[in-house]
C-alpha cells in the first residue's frame, strides 16, 4: 500500500532564494513524498528532487591559478518554478568540468564528484551514487585555512532511513554529506553559506578542499539563487 508524507520546508526549499528572473522569492508549501517498499533511494526523494532523464545545461565556468580553482556553477535548474522538472548539475572537481549525465545515469556513474540543484548538494557516494566519495566538514572561513585533509570525520550521502523514510535537512533538501550547509535569513528570504570548507575524499585517496563563496554568484543578477561561486584546491 502506498503511503504519502508531506515534508514541509522552513519558509523556502531552495526556491525561496530567487527565481531565474531574479524576482522576489516566495516560499514553497512543501514536498509530497511517495514511498514504496524496497527502500530504493530514488523512490523516497521529494518530488522536487526526483531523478530526471535529462542532462543539465548549466554552465561550469572556472579558472585555475596558483593551485586554486575559482568560478561559478549554474545550478539554477531553470528557476524555482521549473526546477522539479530539471536535473542536477554534475561536476568533476578534478577536471573542473561538467559531467554530462542525466540523473538516472548518474546513479551508476563514478565520473562525477558533486551534484547541485538549487540548494540541494550531493556527493557521489552513499545514497547518491556508486563513486565512494566521502566528505568531511571543516569549520573554516577561508580555503587558505585548510592545508591538510582531516584524518577522520568523513561521511557519504544518507537521506534514506532504515525504515525507508526520507531524511532531510531543515530546508527540505535530502540529507547529504554537506549537512546543513547554509543559514537562512527569514526576513530577507535569502541564504548564506556557513563558514565551512568541505574536504572530498575519493576511493583512490585523492582529496579536494571546496568552499562555497556565495549562493548568489551571478553579478548581473545578484538575487539569482543557485548560481554558486565556489573555490577549491587539491590537497596533498
Report the location of each language-model feature.
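Surface-exposed, beta-sheet-biased, low-hydrophobicity segments with strongly acidic/polar composition
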Residues: 30-236
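C-terminal motif of bacterial Sec signal peptides marking the signal peptidase cleavage site
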Residues: 14-16
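Hydrophobic helical h-region of N-terminal Sec-dependent signal peptides
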Residues: 7-11
